[in-house]
Amino acid sequence: YDAPSPMPDYYRWMPGYQTDPVTRLEMENIWRANDVRYTQIDWDEFYRQNRNSKDGSATYLMEDRVERIANMQLLAEGITRISERLTVRYGIRAARTDSRFYKQMRDLMGRSYFVDRDYYLIDDGVYGNKLQNDLRHPDRIIREGDRFGYDYDLRRNEIGAGGSLEYRADRLRAFIAAEVGAASVFRRGHYEKELFAGNKSFGKSRALHFAPYLFRASAGYSFSVRHHLEMTVYASSRTPDGDDLFLNLEYNNRPVEDPTEEKRYGAELNYTWSGRNVRFRATLFVVRTADGMQVRHYYDDFYATYSDMAAAGIGTLRYGAEATALIRLAYRWNLTLAASAGRYRYADNPVVTVYADANNEVLDRNATSYMGDCSVGNTPQLTGFAGLNYYGPKGWGVQAEAAWTGNRFVEPSLVLSLIHIS
């Protein structure tokens, strides 16, 4: 705050942001000339700015965003062979995950301290007098190695019980499995944020409860030694990630409204052919998800305020085909080929509620984000792979690989697809 952005690609430093033609041309020339004072991080300037700070505290600093995760799991399993062909497996499990998140000062860049406040609120006409990140330690002096900004725990408790039944004959294999469980998630804040004083930020939040499950069935048949066909279907639900369950995990105990499990339904058909020097496998698949949840933080230009957006009812449809082949070219030479083609798209229009980040005021409730039929981003929908391996004597080898991806789309924005209702 109260200093130029350290990011060279900050949008205000880009030529396209400049409205004055002369300034725009100057910025274009700077970037074309690759002037490192503008195109790279200027560390010397950060130290100079810190030396000239009015109150002696750091203006620029380096921080670590620390995540400390501890997992504990207990598992008990049993197996009963009812007959030569029929096997029953069963078990129970319990798990607990404790995750601690906080910011830690790494480097004050020439200064000796930093005051722990929310500096982005200083010029706010409404909340400019609520700057404390921790009311229990107001205006805390932060030195290198100290925690500041936010500090909270996220705990997930899970328990489940399940079983499976497997039947094997000469050519036929059938398998069915089921698991049901219960899960709870809660946040525990170690700082009392002035914006959300009391138990709105400090201490334990309300626990959120879920009932995840998994049902899976498969059947496979070997027509001969070389030909095998297998079909699998499944249905499951999972507990959402903690980031998608609270409006702002860093300093707010408030959960989203009506949290629910994400549902997933799918089917696969696999064919395998095994020859003397070739092994080939082809797969057809379809996966449908529903009731997904996401929380995003952004500056809403429509409402001119920093906002927390909670989206519910996110659903996707993915289907396609995959094929792999392992070819033995010679005694020491192997060739691996793989390809996939699919269509991955959003199938539902999520329902979105927008909150003001500073006070959780509802800015827009149950608006529709028209993402249905948009392509899922960040995942290639066409892929190809080839790998050549040579295995030499005495354990050494040489490997060469090539890969290609296509039809990769930018992830659609829940915000840009949003229709505001006023």
Predicted features and spans:
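Repeated loop/turn-to-beta-strand initiation elements of outer-membrane beta-barrel proteins
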Residues: 85-88, 171-174, 226-229, 277-280, ...
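Surface-exposed extracellular loop regions of Gram-negative outer-membrane beta-barrel proteins
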Residues: 132, 136-141, 184-196, 207, ...
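Transmembrane beta-barrel strands of outer-membrane/channel proteins
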Residues: 1, 90-96, 176-182, 231-235, ...
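Gram-negative outer-membrane beta-barrel transporters
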Residues: 168-171, 285-288, 309-414
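Outer-membrane beta-barrel domain signature, strongest for Gram-negative TonB-dependent receptors
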Residues: 1-99, 103, 279-283
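Conserved small/polar residues in nucleotide/adenosyl-binding loops
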Residues: 419-421
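Surface-exposed loop/turn segments flanking beta-strands in extracellular/periplasmic regions
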Residues: 3-17, 43-52, 103-147, 195-200, ...
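Signature of Gram-negative outer-membrane beta-barrel scaffolds
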Residues: 61, 65, 87-224, 351, ...
